[in-house]
Amino acid sequence: MQGTKIRLLTGGLLMLATVGYVQAEALQPDPAWQQGTLANGFQWQVLATPQRPSDRIEVRLSVNIGSLSESTQQSGFSHFIPRLALTQNGGLPTMQARSLWQQSIDPKRPLPPAIVSYDYSLFNLSLPNNRNDLLKEALSWLASASGKMSITPEAVNHALQGEDMVATWPADTKEGWWRYRLKGSTMLGHDPAAALKQPVDIAQLKDYYHKWYTPDAMTLIVVGNVDSRSVAEQINKTFGGLKGKRETPVAVPTLSPLPTTPVSIMTDAVRQDKLSLMWDAPWQPIRDSVALQRYWRDDLAREALFWHVQQNLSKSNIKDIGLGFDCRVLYQRAQCAINIESPGERLNANLTTVARELAKVRDNGLPQDEFDALIAQKNLELQKLFATYARTDTYLLISQRMRSLQNQVVDIAPEQYQKLRQEFLNSLTVDMLNQYLRQQLSQDMALVLQQPQGEPEYNMKDLQATREKLMAPAPAAAAASNSAGDVAQGRSEATDIPPAQ
């Protein structure tokens, strides 16, 4: 959910000049999604996909609790509770429960049956299509795990002796870059992969489970070729009897702003040097048309910048360089990067090439012909919107829905998307994109180098000097950039929500 990559870069502080005067239109949730809240606070959302009859039925149960709410004595509880649940039958006969889980993993896209992070615990099931009996069993098992689990010394010992099938997000919580990013955050002392303290305090574990696993902190999502009304009735029958209510607010994870100090990090996550020029800004929810258009404008500018730089590198026949842009939303911060993958001996030279191209775009803007080609491409994509939506499978639909909920983005119907998107493309100009890029490329960037373990540490001062030499803005440009930033501070954003929802 968190940290999902998005296509390109981040930003956007141009509201007064572009869409600040536009009347904001509230985004209307897609009515295809049926949703409700039971009397005990349990929330559910169902999307029937008759256009995808052969797809698997995707089921997710998210519980709003993770390792961040653990005390020192409770370390490892949030990870262990799903592990314990996965060893129990959930009210089903033993062979029936075993068969359910054997069929609940998509062989093409296998997911761990449960994932635990700092602020959520998630159960994943992917069921064969046209198996309403399995869906009924899955809901029954989830309801049992959500409030009726057996927590005894025997059950705990049995779970500890078995395989731990619970994954964490991120997958490696001790990876060097991630630990660096957590500096200054309370998350640093609350590892979702932490081992359970021995001996286990059964009474304390039971209290933790009943305190946090309450129906008003749960959301069930089902996507597939199902009868929405029938599933809604089954949800009410299965989950309506869960007891409990949150009395203590859950801890909210936060990240500090990304430091702009150059840093080199040794990590097993890369096989060759990876240098990132990074931006970091608060993430803003997308609930109205102005926020959506602002994101679209920024997104197109990022895409245009990427292809402009990529094409110029290709024309120059630059070798031994891999260029990528990515962006992700991490705990309400939009973190984006221009990534340069390169052998160590070519790193400074390749940074020189990329920085020079970025400086040219900042100072001169993108040419009109590249802008026109981009708009033509986006208009063509828009014409294929409904065909694209029909090809979007249930796995992608549910993944997108969960990111929308995580990042406070309103999912809209394809019809509203088409209308707003066409209005946006018709009103956009190359000057709007260039003003955004000028501001974005004039601000301070973090310089982060990830190196494979065992390599000699690179001198970051050399890379910093190269970047500053090539990308230092002229005084007039710097003043204009600072002024724009002061006017619209905090409006920078990015999203990992694909557009065709």
For each feature predicted by the language model, list its residue ranges:
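An aromatic/glycine/proline-enriched structural segment found at the starts
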Residues: 219-276, 280-284, 454-488
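Non-catalytic, conformational "gating/processing" segments within enzyme and secreted inhibitor domains
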Residues: 202-237, 442-446
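Acidic/histidine-enriched segments that form metal/cofactor-coordinating
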Residues: 100-208, 352-356, 363-398
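Gram-negative bacterial Sec-dependent N-terminal signal peptides
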Residues: 1-23
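C-terminal regions of mature proteins
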Residues: 25-26, 219-224, 375-501
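Histidine-acidic residue clusters that define the catalytic metal-binding segment
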Residues: 25-34, 178-218, 252-254, 283-290, ...
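Buried hydrophobic packing residues in well-ordered domains
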Residues: 41, 61, 79-80, 123, ...
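M16/MPP (pitrilysin/insulinase) zinc-metallopeptidase core fold and M16-derived inactive scaffolds
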Residues: 58-126, 172, 187-191, 303-332
